[in-house]
């Protein structure tokens, strides 16, 4: 079952010597099931920190992060890790693929890390998805183009069937044409899963692909007019 994710009165503070600095202050944020949102902010605005709060990697200094009726800060770290593994899929700017492993092996890696046996069906599904996205399953990751690396990571997320996909600067280093295709593929993939999507970027080009836009500046999240 997919639930609404909410941030209520959330603040994240850090101490620098005797001074206390507020990194983020978010009065309210809601992500409905299947909703897709773009968050734009300049470099250093706190976009990655925001995603870490949404996913429970970071806990707020004050306020609550809720998934349905579950308050993430009330969970132990192992339970938060399990919640994240079950519900959240990440696309990072640096791809996080392992050299020496094939595209297929990289896609199936989360199942290996979780000590789960990879079934023939999962292997076949991953192979088919890679081919569908134009990636040779047998190519080692260090030999893939940046676009192929990105699509490999997307397939890895699809195989996890998350209810929330968080994308951190997925169009970085891509030209306008490839950036558009990458965002379209991501939106299509999220839609095929019925997953919610939060994409953060400094790239103005991505905004036209989303109905809901937010801006992160000076540590605050506001609707984009």
List each language-model region with its residue ranges:
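Conserved ABC ATPase "signature" region
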Residues: 71, 120-137
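Conserved catalytic motifs of ABC-family nucleotide-binding domains
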Residues: 161
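Catalytic Walker B motif of ABC-type/P-loop ATPase nucleotide-binding domains
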Residues: 165-168
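ABC ATPase NBD coupling module
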Residues: 72-89
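Conserved ABC ATPase signature
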Residues: 140-150
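Conserved ABC transporter NBD signature motif
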Residues: 63-71
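Helix-to-loop junction immediately C-terminal to a conserved catalytic motif
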Residues: 55
């Amino acid at each position: 079952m997919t639930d609404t994710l909410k941030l209520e009165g959330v603040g994240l503070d850090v101490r620098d010597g005797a001074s206390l600095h507020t990194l983020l202050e978010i009065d309210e944020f809601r992500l409905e099931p299947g909703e897709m949102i773009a968050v734009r902010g300049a470099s250093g605005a706190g976009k990655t920190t925001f995603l870490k709060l949404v996913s429970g990697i970071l806990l707020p200094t004050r306020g609550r992060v809720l998934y349905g009726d579950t308050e993430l800060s009330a969970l132990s770290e192992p339970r938060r890790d399990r919640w994240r593994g079950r519900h959240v899929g990440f696309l990072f700017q640096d791809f996080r693929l392992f050299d020496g492993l094939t595209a297929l092996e990289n896609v199936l890696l989360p199942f290996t890390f979780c000590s789960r046996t990879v079934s023939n069906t999962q292997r076949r599904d991953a192979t088919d998805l890679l081919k569908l996205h134009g990636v040779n399953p047998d190519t080692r990751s260090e030999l893939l183009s940046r676009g192929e690396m990105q699509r490999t990571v997307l397939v890895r997320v699809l195989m996890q069937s998350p209810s929330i996909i968080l994308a951190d600067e997925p169009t970085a280093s891509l030209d306008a044409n490839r950036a558009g295709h990458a965002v379209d593929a991501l939106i299509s993939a999220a839609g095929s899963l019925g997953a919610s999507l939060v994409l953060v970027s400094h790239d103005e080009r991505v905004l036209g692909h989303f109905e809901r836009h937010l801006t992160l500046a000076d540590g605050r999240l506001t609707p984009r007019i």
